[in-house]
Amino acid sequence: YTGAASCMAKSRDAMTFHVDSVKQLISWARENMELSELEDIKWVHEDALKFAQRELKRGNKYDGIIMDPPAWGIGAKKERWKLEDKLDDLMSNAAKILDKKGFLIMNTYSPKIDLSLLESKANDHFSKRNFEVVELWMKTATGKDLFYGNLLRVK
């Protein structure tokens, strides 16, 4: 499923940028694009926060932003980070480059970002927009409920 959201956006004729700091994930996503018989996704090997900061300086706006950040990671230049430390900056910059009629979807998988924190940050950065925050659950093969993160959707 790597790059699935990018492929879906491209299949709807959206100009699509796929940003990831992990080259291997970009390679897999590109392969999925080709298997889906799509083309012209812009592949950006960079930290998403740095990309958003640069786009803000350029004055670029986006009709849609889909973020699926890991709970922690190592950036393109080997810098270590944790989502809970970068969440405010990430949401702030995303809010600034999101068109006023655009949408944003953000999944979080860090156990340190609970629903109330995500809602609080959404209020900080999207208070004039309609948004919702929900928990993500799935059924296991044995029928048990498994919590795996939270979702922010800005409309």
Q: Language-model segments: what does each one mean?
A:
Residues 21-64:
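S-adenosyl-L-methionine
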Residues 23-25, 45, 64-93:
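Mobile active-site "lid"/loop adjacent to the S-adenosyl-L-methionine
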Residues 7-10, 56, 91-95:
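A structural alpha-helix within SAM-dependent methyltransferase catalytic domains
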Residues 98-99:
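Helix-to-beta-strand junctions that scaffold the AdoMet/dcAdoMet cofactor pocket
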Residues 15, 40-42, 130-132:
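Conserved beta-strand segments of alpha/beta enzyme cores
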Residues 2-16:
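Conserved SAM-binding loop of SAM-dependent methyltransferases across substrates and taxa
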Residues 103-155:
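C-terminal catalytic and target-recognition region of SAM-dependent MTase-like enzymes
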